[in-house]
Amino acid sequence: MEIRNIKEFEKASKKLQKDTLKIALALLFLIGAALLALIFGQANSKGLLLIFAAVIGGYMAMNIGANDVSNNVGPAVGSKAISMGGAILIAAVCEMLGAIIAGGEVVSTIKGRIVSPEFINDAHVFINVMLASLLSGALWLHVATLIGAPVSTSHSVVGGIMGAGMAAAGMSAINWHFLSGIVASWVISPLMGALIAMFFLMLIKKTIAYKEDKKSAALKVVPYLVALMSLAFSWYLIVKVLKRLYAVGFEIQLACGCVLALLIFILFKRFVLKKAPQLENSHESVNELFNVPLIFAAALLSFAHGANDVANAIGPLAAISQTLEDASSPMGSTLNSVPLWIMVVGAAGIALGLSLYGPKLIKTVGSEITELDKMQAFCIALSAVITVLLASQLGLPVSSTHIVVGAVFGVGFLRERLREQSRRRFARIRDNIVAAHFGEDLEEIEGFLERFDKANLKEKSLMLESLKKSKNTAIALELKKKEKKSLKKVYKEEVIKRSILKKIVTAWLVTVPVSALLGALLFVALGFIEKYF
């Protein structure tokens, strides 16, 4: 008893030390954000207010890293394509690069079109709206991370701006037309994610998983899938990065993307051919070919997430900074470029939040939503890559959470349909087998089929292997080759595990109203503090 208590005390002590170190690092980062605002911010006499806003922006960025980045690397970690440490390192680097290189366009979207300019002409009121929205979004994300619920950072910030804007100038201040486009993108994104993931999962099943010679099929198909992913990402990079230096037409963009995709195809084809002698003709062995593509997908998603969701952390901060520099036009239509120091606060905050507090939700997304193998994880990741890059290019602050979970929904729905079909197929196969046999063998065969129907996946695999080895048994002799093949196909199509989605769906539903309520309350609280203190 005493030894157990000592071990529990040591465990609690180590956890406390670890948590204390995390808090210390987070505080150091917030101090760094304040120093950046002090040194590089140009807020004239309102420097203290800008420093406070920078701290809140850094706090928001850390919460985005802790909560939202899990969607990018969760499938890769959950399928064991990459370790937790490797995933965090890749995601942190790519998040920072995406935020700094390609994050400006979405920042401009967040910055001035959610609240109609003509309703808030006072710079002081506008700054309070932005502060309230930023803090409300950060607080809700913090709570969601503590309870282990991956939520939309876009929903959190937009809800906060809505609530604070309505508290400041009423419902008429909200640009409902613009928000309707954002809401539409929130619906379209998970739907696109689901449909694309379903398509690729079915494609992989038809072209690889259901083939007798899985090894040869995978060596042919996987390089094309990687090339497609490369095309999407390279085209995105050309559009987002090169357009700042030199404007190119669509034809040139597509041609450059195709050239890069072809190069990746050739390199990856050589890679899989070198790996071919080590592969076996089995599902598990073929799965290993998806390791590198999954790591590649995690990097792409992280880059796109940094480009897209950095706006949620620094959009309001950029608006506050610009307003403090030019108070005469707080909601003007002309948007200045976002200062580099603000981009650094957002990018570094996301990377630090991921490193310190990201593993919890990475495990949630990677294993609790659904149990994935590498093929299924690749379908989800590829679907998310295509959807989120398209959305980011359009300048829409969509939710990567919705995209990834939408893809999981799609994969789960397809697997559920396949399971139902496999059950019906098994019933037909059973009837056909029973009808074709009689006598003493029939009783033994019926017993085998009943055990097969009730067995889990691992047990089914062992039972099918026993048919190959037990050539002298009645079952092995009486079950025809075609009947064994049919049973094998039923085994392949059974679903491993149903997704646990209630917590995530509930979090989606309450994010906007909760963040809006917090935004309104914080706006009122800021006004009260300024008036009486």
From Swiss-Prot:
InterPro entries: Phos_transporter (IPR001204). The chain crosses the membrane at residues 23-43, 47-67, 81-101, 129-149, 156-176, 182-202, 221-241, 248-268, 286-306, 338-358, 372-392, 509-529. It comes from the Bacteria. The keyword Nucleotide-binding does not apply. Keywords: Cell membrane, Membrane, Phosphate transport, Transmembrane, Transmembrane helix, Transport. GO terms for cellular component: plasma membrane. The keyword Chaperone does not apply. It is a multi-pass membrane protein. One of its GO terms (molecular function) is phosphate transmembrane transporter activity. GO terms for biological process: phosphate ion transmembrane transport. Belongs to the inorganic phosphate transporter (PiT) (TC 2.A.20) family. This is Putative phosphate permease jhp_1384. The lineage of its organism: Bacteria, Pseudomonadati, Campylobacterota, Epsilonproteobacteria, Campylobacterales.
